[in-house]
């Protein structure tokens, strides 16, 4: 089957925002106007097309990034609706990795919110071009120009309106297009009847002022336009649009639009902007990867003629078709029934069927082309971030970075029958979500699950009960602490057993030094002259890795330590891998006496929004929880406080804040970094973990 839409006419976009800014409603309207659905589903009524998991419909939030495809103005638009809640950051990250552009949805009353900052930062890291949609213009307190200013103040973004609203709150009735310099007036509730007319007299001065600002801002990014502007020449609409497109694709400029998805206003113009200003796969740099055979960098330009290369960005278990692997095709063509090579795992995989997804309904297709996003059935070994390529033309594409979990819970099955089911359920959920970890405590036999926050684990335990019918008891949440060394030291590990039978002998000298934060464990072999034979070196490293998994103070994993093996000795007969593994673990224990071991705790960036009258209470909460205030901002008669607070002190805070502010205060938190716990807290943790 031939390609239906050319690469120039393909857009892969994400819709991202702070929780509750109206992302899913916006996506719903896009599907409605592009003819994908005939009846609009409201998120707050639990009937949205994109939020198809039961928990999403109950909670009114988006958890998984549903992928869907739509058509607009002769173009194919593949849309990924991403969650706005911080506990589901990985969903945002992995969708940004495979998108070419994004629409950032703001709540026009609140402007840039904490999670907007997080997703904006992630999109900047991945170099994703964006347009901004100031939604909820019909809401009380909606302020378009405040929202635009918040993009400058909080994100330092070169963002400028290409539209202005006509009226706001209940009186929001249309939009001024600053490129055509025309007004679009909505005359019915479905937003399908739009009158284009001259700009109302009372808005002409404002429109001229913002048109001038727009031209100036765009000219700053474009030399040719700047020359025309300075010489006072007329700049045509076509020239202005072309310059906005170039600057947006180069991530130098962000067009800002306005509307109300709920009231069906502004969505079609936003779709036009997706086509006009966001890139096709041909507009962005060709993806790079490493050839596993030569270790050399290779590129894969977006073209059907190139060898097939794709990235798996999400695994999902579908009750009807089983395991689905979502993938983005960067180059080449793939037919169902053919074989590909998973270069990340070195395994050959058969593509059973290829499905094009629409939220949770699906359509089977025979072929996918460069630039497409689809799901495959039948892949057994592929996980998030794996590269799938032509067997004859291997390449490993840059993978998806997975943040470390910060919170853990103990789960135990209620009955023997639940035990086996729970193992399978947890394995499947972990396959779908790389930030969800499942471990078994070797000493107690307990199953411990870890994730990005309480809501994250709540949803997963809930899915285990609903989808896999597993009944389980869940313990109280625990913090994922870490351990490290704060000083350098040298230590010997000597292990000798020679009492009848085959003896054991291992002897090592290791220098331990603190590593940079986030660098993890690094091992260096500095042995000269074979005092420790080469075949035992990996055993020394393995011995250290295994011992570090259980720490030296309270049994927490050790991070950010360098170990340099520089001396030792061996016995011709009695030395073995096991002996050197044990010797290495003894060296670590010995080092702990003088390397100033410390326990680290996750610090959260907490953003608390509360009425001004309650500011004193909020500051008191932060101090009482060992937190430190990082900044404050007044918004009308509310105060926004940003602070770093240990995760251990944040359990149950929602209830405290609610009662202190009569339910008017809210907070968001996102993991920021690890920090040493105070000595008194460290002693308590050690005491608790040694069972005293």
From Swiss-Prot:
Biological process (GO) annotations held by this record are:
ribosome disassembly
**Name of the featured protein:** Elongation factor G
Q: Does the keyword Nucleus apply?
A: no
SUPFAM superfamilies, alphabetically? Answer: EF-G C-terminal domain-like, P-loop containing nucleoside triphosphate hydrolases, Ribosomal protein S5 domain 2-like, Translation proteins
Location(s), subcellular:
Cytoplasm
- HAMAP family assigned to the protein according to its UniProt record, in alphabetical order: EF_G_EF_2_B (MF_00054_B)
- Which residues participate in GTP binding? 17-24, 81-85, 135-138
Where do the tr-type G domain residues begin and end?
A: 8-282
Q: Which family does it belong to?
A: Belongs to the TRAFAC class translation factor GTPase superfamily. Classic translation factor GTPase family. EF-G/EF-2 subfamily.
- Sum up the protein's function in the record's words: Catalyzes the GTP-dependent ribosomal translocation step during translation elongation. During this step, the ribosome changes from the pre-translocational (PRE) to the post-translocational (POST) state as the newly formed A-site-bound peptidyl-tRNA and P-site-bound deacylated tRNA move to the P and E sites, respectively. Catalyzes the coordinated movement of the two tRNA molecules, the mRNA and conformational changes in the ribosome.
**Source organism (scientific name):** Streptococcus agalactiae serotype III (strain NEM316)
Keywords assigned by UniProt, alphabetized? Cytoplasm, Elongation factor, GTP-binding, Nucleotide-binding, Protein biosynthesis
Write out the GO MF terms: GTP binding; GTPase activity; translation elongation factor activity
The primary location reported for this protein is cytoplasm
Sorted alphabetically, the Gene Ontology cellular component annotations on this record are: cytoplasm
PROSITE patterns per the UniProt record, alphabetical: G_TR_1 (PS00301), G_TR_2 (PS51722)
Which Pfam family, just one, is annotated for this protein? GTP_EFTU_D2
SMART domains assigned: EFG_C, EFG_IV
């Amino acid at each position: 089957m031939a390609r239906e839409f050319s690469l120039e006419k393909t857009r892969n976009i994400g819709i991202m925002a702070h929780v509750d800014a109206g992302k899913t409603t916006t996506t719903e309207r896009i599907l409605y106007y592009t003819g994908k659905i005939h009846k609009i589903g409201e998120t707050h009524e639990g009937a949205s097309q994109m939020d198809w998991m039961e928990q999403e419909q109950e909670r009114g939030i988006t958890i998984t990034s549903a992928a869907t495809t739509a058509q607009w103005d002769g173009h194919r638009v593949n849309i990924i609706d991403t969650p706005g809640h911080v506990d589901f950051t990985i969903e945002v990250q992995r969708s940004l990795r495979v998108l070419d552009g994004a629409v950032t949805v703001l709540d026009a009353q609140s402007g840039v919110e904490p999670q907007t900052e997080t997703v904006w930062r992630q999109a900047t890291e991945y170099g994703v071009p964006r347009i901004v949609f100031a939604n909820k213009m019909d809401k009380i307190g909606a302020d378009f120009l405040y929202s635009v200013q918040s993009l400058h103040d909080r994100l330092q973004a070169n963002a400028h309106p290409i539209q202005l609203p006509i009226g706001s709150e209940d009186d929001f009735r249309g939009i001024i297009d600053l490129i055509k310099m025309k007004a679009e007036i909505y005359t019915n509730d479905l937003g399908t009847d739009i009158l284009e007319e001259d700009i109302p007299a009372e808005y002409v001065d404002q429109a001229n002022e913002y048109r001038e600002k727009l031209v100036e801002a765009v000219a700053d990014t474009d030399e040719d336009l700047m020359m025309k502007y300075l010489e006072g020449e007329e700049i045509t609409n076509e020239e202005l649009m072309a310059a906005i497109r170039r600057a947006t694709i180069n991530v130098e400029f962000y067009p800002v639009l306005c509307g109300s998805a709920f009231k069906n206003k502004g969505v079609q113009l936003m779709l036009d902007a997706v086509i006009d200003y966001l890139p096709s796969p041909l507009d962005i740099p060709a993806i790079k990867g490493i050839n596993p055979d030569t270790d050399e960098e290779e590129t894969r330009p977006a073209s059907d003629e190139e060898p097939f290369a794709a990235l798996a960005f999400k695994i999902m278990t579908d009750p009807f078709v089983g395991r689905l692997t979502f993938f983005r095709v960067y180059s080449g063509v793939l037919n169902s029934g053919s074989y590909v090579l998973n270069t990340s795992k070195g395994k050959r995989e058969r593509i059973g069927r290829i499905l094009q997804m629409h939220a949770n309904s699906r359509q089977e297709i025979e072929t996918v082309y460069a630039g497409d996003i689809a799901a495959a059935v039948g892949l057994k070994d592929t996980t998030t971030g794996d590269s799938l390529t032509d067997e004859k033309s291997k390449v490993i594409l840059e993978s998806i970075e997975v943040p470390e979990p910060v919170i853990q819970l103990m789960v135990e099955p209620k009955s023997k029958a639940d035990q086996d089911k729970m193992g399978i359920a947890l394995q499947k959920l972990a396959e779908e979500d790389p930030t969800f970890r499942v471990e078994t405590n070797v000493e107690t036999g307990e199953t411990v699950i870890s994730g990005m926050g309480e809501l994250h684990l709540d949803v997963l335990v809930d899915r285990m009960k609903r989808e896999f019918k597993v009944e389980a008891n869940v313990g109280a949440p625990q913090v994922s602490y870490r351990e490290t060394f704060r000083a350098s030291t040298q230590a010997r590990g000597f292990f000798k057993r020679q009492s009848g039978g085959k003896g054991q002998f291992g002897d090592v000298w290791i220098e331990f030094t603190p590593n940079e934060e986030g660098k993890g464990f690094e091992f260096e072999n500095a042995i000269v002259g074979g005092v420790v034979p080469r075949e035992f070196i990996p055993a020394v490293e393995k011995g250290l890795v295994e011992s570090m998994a259980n720490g030296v103070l309270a049994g927490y994993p050790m991070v950010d330590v360098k170990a340099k093996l520089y001396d030792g000795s061996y016995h011709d007969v009695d030395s073995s891998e096991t002996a050197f593994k044990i010797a290495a673990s003894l060296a670590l224990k010995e080092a702990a006496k003088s390397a100033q071991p410390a326990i680290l705790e996750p610090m959260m960036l907490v953003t608390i929004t509360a009425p001004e009258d309650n500011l004193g209470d909020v500051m008191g909460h932060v101090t009482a929880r060992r937190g430190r205030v990082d900044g404050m901002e007044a918004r009308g008669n509310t105060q926004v406080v940003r602070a770093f607070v240990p995760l251990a002190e944040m359990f149950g805070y929602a209830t405290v804040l609610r009662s202190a502010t009569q339910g008017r205060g809210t907070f968001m938190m996102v993991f920021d970094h690890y920090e040493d716990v105070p000595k008194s807290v460290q002693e308590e943790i050690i005491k608790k973990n040694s069972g005293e």
